[in-house]
């Protein structure tokens, strides 16, 4: 198949809109010390005409407050603040024409302040994610049948969990959740002229882990996590594209020593505005801003904030 400018535009639009949307999901979830990111896709989703890509993404986010166990939003107290930084290095390659494999390696840094405590900065390697995607049908190929894709991912606990030693008084050295995570998902998307509409559902399950030293050990298992995402994107004739995405992540109560730990469930909404600017046939810039919508009672047991992302991608056809 030869790739005309119109086909290439649709292809880039689909890859960009969903890739950037999931990037903000990953970051928002990673900021939760108790919860893992969705991890089902990377910010480097391949366009249909692309064979491989590599990229680097920089993230900056600030915590503005948190949702308590009753779902009420509370701003940070005086003297308390948090700045989260992350640099993601990722690559993706196409297999079987409609499939793709990807790898993401994150570096994570955190700066925290608290009243009566000196400022603290720490970080390191985060949890590495490998992912896969297979498109059974393609968006825009049929007027009646949308694009349908299966998503899968596996996250390795390469980061340091919050219970690790020598993390600092404010635990800024924590960079992971300390558990393996398996993700599966389903994406449905369709194009309508220059518009793209997407709906995705993701399911994540984490392995159990033992925390502490005998005889004071605690057996912990995080509950399953569900994420629901919808996106709307528009591509201009220049192939510049803009998108708006909304997501909602839900997680049940954790199990502690086999007993349901009531009051530990989580909820977090995220609203994202993103864009892509093609620099050439092989290079593109992607950017996004997101906010966790500090509205009672949308969240639960979660820090809430806002962030900025900037990504550069090099692809091959």
What label would you give each PLM region?
Residues 42-51, 98, 138-147, 194, ...:
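Short loop/turn motifs that connect adjacent beta-strands in outer-membrane beta-barrel proteins
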Residues 50, 81-87, 122-128, 146, ...:
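Residues that define the transmembrane beta-barrel architecture of outer-membrane proteins
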Residues 52-62, 103-107, 148-156, 199-205, ...:
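Transmembrane beta-barrel strands of outer-membrane/channel proteins
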Residues 56-58, 89-93, 103, 130-136, ...:
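Residues on the lipid-exposed face of transmembrane beta-strands in outer-membrane beta-barrel proteins
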Residues 60-86, 169-172:
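Surface-exposed strand-loop-strand hairpins of Gram-negative outer-membrane beta-barrel proteins
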Residues 65-77, 209-212, 216-317:
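Outer membrane beta-barrel transmembrane domains
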Residues 79-131:
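Long, hydrophobic/aromatic-enriched structural stretches that serve as scaffold segments
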Residues 109-221:
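Outer-membrane pore/translocation modules
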């Amino acid at each position: 198949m030869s790739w005309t400018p119109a086909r290439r535009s649709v292809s880039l639009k689909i890859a960009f809109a969903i890739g950037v949307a999931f990037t903000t999901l990953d970051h928002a979830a990673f900021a939760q010390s108790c919860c893992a990111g969705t991890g089902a896709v990377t910010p480097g989703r391949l366009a249909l005409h692309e064979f491989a890509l590599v990229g680097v993404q920089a993230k900056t986010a600030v915590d503005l407050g948190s949702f308590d166990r009753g779902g009420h939003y509370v701003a940070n107290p005086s003297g308390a603040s948090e700045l989260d930084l992350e640099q993601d290095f990722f690559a993706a390659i196409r297999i079987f024409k409609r499939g793709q494999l990807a790898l993401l390696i994150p570096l994570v840094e955190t700066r925290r302040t608290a009243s009566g405590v000196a400022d603290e900065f720490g970080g390191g390697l985060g949890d590495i994610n490998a992912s896969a995607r297979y498109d059974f049908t393609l968006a825009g190929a049929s007027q009646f049948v949308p694009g349908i894709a299966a998503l899968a991912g596996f996250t390795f606990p390469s980061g340091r969990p919050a219970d690790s030693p020598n993390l600092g008084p404010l635990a800024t050295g924590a960079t992971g959740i300390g558990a393996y995570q398996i993700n599966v998902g389903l994406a449905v998307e369709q194009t309508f002229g220059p518009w793209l509409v997407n709906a995705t559902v993701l399911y994540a399950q984490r392995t159990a882990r033992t925390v502490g030293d005998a005889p004071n050990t605690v057996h912990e298992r995080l509950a399953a996590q569900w994420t629901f995402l919808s996106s709307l994107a528009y591509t201009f004739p220049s192939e510049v594209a803009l998108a708006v995405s909304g997501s909602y992540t839900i997680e049940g109560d954790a199990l502690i020593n086999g007993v349901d730990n009531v009051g530990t469930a989580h909820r977090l909404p995220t609203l994202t505005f993103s864009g892509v600017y093609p620099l050439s046939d092989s290079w593109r810039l992607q950017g996004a801003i997101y906010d966790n919508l500090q509205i009672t009672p949308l969240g639960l047991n979660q820090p809430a904030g806002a962030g900025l992302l900037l990504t550069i991608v090099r692809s091959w056809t």
